[in-house]
């Protein structure tokens, strides 16, 4: 159902069974997949592609001009959202700044109310952003990561797959896959065993990641010594190899553990 008060440019492409609630505005370069629901007072502007069976909450603004001085009006940039993703009330997602690029949100994500995804971010599949989470420009959030409420993620930071960032944190370095982190700045606290278990990752794989975490964060070794040890002892395991590759690719550096707490105080969830 398209409410008569909605303003939809005739050049916009709406799939089958798309619904648009009152007073929403949809621009000419917008494409919406089958079965997607657009709430009231939503603004979709610029080049926006939304997949099938998504829900866009009241007051969300998607495709807005980025808050970045280097942006130039008229360049071909946009926002791309996958299938079955939920964008809740008053979320803002800004278009990219680099020509030919999109700010991206994957499939099966949940972006809770009033969260912000800035220009050129790349959010993977099955990601959860909790209320008031803020991603600044060029942030990467890999599959199945969770970012807690009121958490700010700094420019170019990366959050690895299955990572869990606690609420009210400040992220200014990369958070490796499978790691739970919290604080200002965020520091490593544990392995996200619960998230891994819920995703069906077997106990042997969880133990391998936990062993790598102990070497990296609980052994007292310097990173330059700990990482080669992880490679030598556990690098043959696919998930540990993923962890190693993420750390080696880091440009900002990865988070450390909280130096105010001894290794015995770092909580380790039962496998």
What are these regions (language model features)?
Residues 1-5, 10-11, 16-17, 53, ...:
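Terminal amphipathic alpha-helical/low-complexity segments used for targeting or macromolecular assembly
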Residues 1-187:
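Structural signal for interior beta-strand "rungs" in well-ordered beta-sheet cores
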